[in-house]
Structures are given as C-alpha cells and as structure tokens.
Amino acid sequence: MSAVRAVWNVLVPPLIVGVLFVGTWEIIVRVFDIKPFLLPAPSSIWTTLGDNWSKVWDAMLITGANALVGLLFGVVCGVALSFVLMRFNVVNELVTPLAVALNAIPIIVLVPVFNNMFASTTEVPRRLMVTLIVSFIVLLNVAKGLRQVSATHMELLHSYAASPSEILRKARIPNAMSYLFTALKIAAPVAVITAFVSEYFGGSQNGLGYGITSNAAISRTAASWGYVVGACLLGLAFYLAAVLLERLASPSQRSTHHQPTNQQSTNQQARGLDPGGATA
C-alpha cells in the first residue's frame, strides 16, 4: 500500500500540473484567436502528431541513436579522465578549468566547427558533440566523488595500512558511485538536447532537429511542435532509463533496514586489510 501511495505522490502532482498547463494553453489560443502559425493549440498539435507519428517515430530513433552513442562514449571518457585527475594533481589543476571553460561554450558554436572537421552528412559531428558535453558532466561529478571521501573513512583505512589500490576499491569508488548516477541523470536528457540541437546545422535530414527546423521554415508550426513533443518523450525516456539503472545497480537504496552504518561498513571492509583482524 505504501508503494502505491509513493507512486501516486510522484506521478499525480506532475500530471495535474501538466493537464492544467495544456488546458490553459488551449483556452488562451481559442479565446484570443491566436493564429496557428504563431502558436497552435495543443489539440491541433495532437492531431498533427497522430497523422505524422510514423515520421516522428523514425526521427526519434535517429536522434536517439546519436544521443545514445554519444552518451555511452561520454560516460566512458568522463569516468576514465576522472581517475586520471584523481591520481595526478597537476593534471587536475590543468584540466578542470579547461573542462569548465569548454563546457560553457554554446552547442551552436561548436557544431559548425565539427561539421567542417568531418563530413557534415555523417552522424560523427553530432555524436562527437554529445560525447564532449556528456564527458564534461561525468568528469566533474565523478572526479569530485573520488576525491571527497570521508576523512574518518580515510583515516581508518590508513590505520590498517591500506594500499592506494585498496583505498580506491573500498572507499573512493563506492563513494563516487552516487556522483556517477547523479551525473548520468543529468547527462541523459542533455544528450538528447545536444543531439537534436546539433541536427539544426546539418547531417541526417530525418532527425528531430531537422523535422523542427524544416517544418518551422514553411510555417507548419503544429508539425514542428509535434517533433518537439517527440524530443520531450525521448528525453524523458533517457532520464527514466538512467533512474532505472541507478535502482538496479544500487538495490541497497531501496531497503536500508538491515544495512550497517557507514562507520560499521568501513570497519568491516577495513578488517579484511588487517592480518590480525577477524576473518569470520
């Protein structure tokens, strides 16, 4: 019963807000007689989306593939670089400011550059753009998780003469996991946004970005909004996948009644490092 109530509390409030927003939008368009090419009514968008759903779905698959490939490569690159930054302070001091500065550059500035570097008709520039954005998000978060380990845990492990690799395995990596999943939940929808915005500037002519711009250019605003809805659904799917992955990888978060405290857990881990400790 509590699980049903929890789901109810999570899903119902956003649904109510969404229904109120769409209803208000519909009323405003009809009352003020706003022209469809300026702002179509949600009912018009829904009808057009139904008529063109096969095209929108195909566009979602293309943009989703670019976002997924870039997301996977970005996570791998970000995690790998975070270990390098954790290990070498000099590299951390050099790379972190550069990563922050590059992350502040708008997507619309870098995509044309990548299109010139690679063939604009391929998906490489868009996937590379997603990889770059995602890797920065993952890098900054995971590097922070690897470094900001509890001082108590570190002192306890040092008291057991733990080696750097043992500290990494028993303290730093477990601490960084929550940072990784936080970064993943941020990066997943950002990957979709980056993928379809990158399509504004070339590449495949059947992705979500091209569908938005091409329909807007000929004043088919309702059709353009249909592709926007497709982008929203795709971003939501990526986010929910990240949340599900976190739940599957961290089952202890669902039930903590019989879990030891952080201090007890560290003590148990550290005993395995002490030759004279308990082995039971």
Predicted regions and their residues:
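Generic hydrophobic transmembrane alpha-helix motif, especially the helices
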Residues: 100-137, 144-145
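N-terminal signal-anchor transmembrane alpha helix
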Residues: 8-31
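Periplasmic/extracellular loop-to-transmembrane helix junction in inner-membrane transport proteins
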Residues: 3, 31-75
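Transmembrane-helix boundary motif in ABC transporter permease subunits
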Residues: 69-99
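C-terminal transmembrane helix and the adjacent membrane-cytosol boundary/short C-terminal tail
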Residues: 89, 178, 225-280
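Glycine-rich helix-loop "coupling/hinge" segments at transmembrane-helix boundaries
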Residues: 116-117, 146, 193-231, 254-258
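Short cytoplasmic-facing helical segments at TM-TM junctions of multi-pass membrane proteins
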Residues: 141-180, 209-212
